Amino acid sequence: MNMVGYAGVKTGVPYPVLARASFGIWGANIPALVRAVVACFWYGAQTAAASGAIVALLIRTQWFADFNASTHFLGHTGLEVICFVVIWGLQLLIIQNGMETVRRFQDWAGPAVWVMMLILAIYLCVKSGRFAFTSDIPMDVLLDKTKDAGVPGTPGSWTSLFAVAAIWVTYFSALYLNFCDFARYAPDKASLRKGNIWGLPINLILFSLVAGVTTIAAFDVYGEVLLHPDQISAKFDSWFLAALAALTFAVATLGINVVANFVSPAFDFSNVFPRQIDFKKGGYIAAVIALLLYPFAPWEGSAASFVNIIGATMGPIFGVMMVDYYLIRKGEVDVEALYREDGEFRFQGGWHVNAFIAAGIGAIFSSILPNFTNWLPSWWGVYGWFFGVAIAGIIYYVLRTAALGAGARTAKA
């Protein structure tokens, strides 16, 4: 995050513009659209998840339960559709005034989720009669609950520990690309570092501990492994606590969605058509695409694998951009040239062929081979993002330095 963030602080440009330095003034539209496609898909998926938490809360009331059971359209129940549209609309309100509204929402949403999670944890610990970081959950139950996580090895082994760490790092792969969309507003690098330290390792570790304590206490109380606040809320006798749990999940999901899946495509679409689309219109396009996808609910089927395969190409793109910025350009970019069609970043007609060669080869090893062949070890896919970054970065460095060397020799001649 800091590597991309420093570039954002120094240049003050969003991700699709920074990508022009390595992929070309027109070629940068491809990595921008890759990020936008994945974001639109998950925008719909996260909106559906947040609305699902509200549905789980409302059907505790008999009238809503009857309505949910008796009405169906667009492949969903009537209540699911209404809640999805409401959550979808709320997200549009959040970005009404651009990035400033997003910042204000995050300032409120982050602490609110923490408060609600602590209340849930304290309530369940009191009800279970203990506060514990260790659990009596049977191993076969844990294995059943985590069978779809794609983590190789036995739970608790070094193999599974490294795999989980890799998955956590890869989880943020989309934000690694477009973090400069946010970092460009930071006053300096020191502020960026401080924010990332508190927001990522410290916040993530502490929140994981609270979530673990909550899950353990919920198992002690209800005899089930409940991994989501909306699942816990379904067990509460108190409507207030049920609402608290549902809102925790909904607000947390909205917070992630607005940052990870709204801001990025807003900038990406506006970059592709800068004269016709501004930030707000780009965000609206992403929201409409997510809404149109809802009747098909592709996130519930095999299409999710397709989008994950596309998402795996983010590693090679990241590798190319970081090698170009830090190793080739030494952190120095002519920002004005990023906005000129005939400047330094025109390369081959606006496309930097070497960058696409490197990213393409990296994508073969990070995405295509692990998902469509059995030529690689079964564990390769878990670390695919890392292989993509390394392979694409190395190839790009070799190709770019060779091209620069050839150019220098030609100039001397």
What are these regions (language model features)?
Residues 318-398, 402, 409-412:
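C-terminal membrane-solvent junction of multi-pass transporters and transport-like membrane proteins
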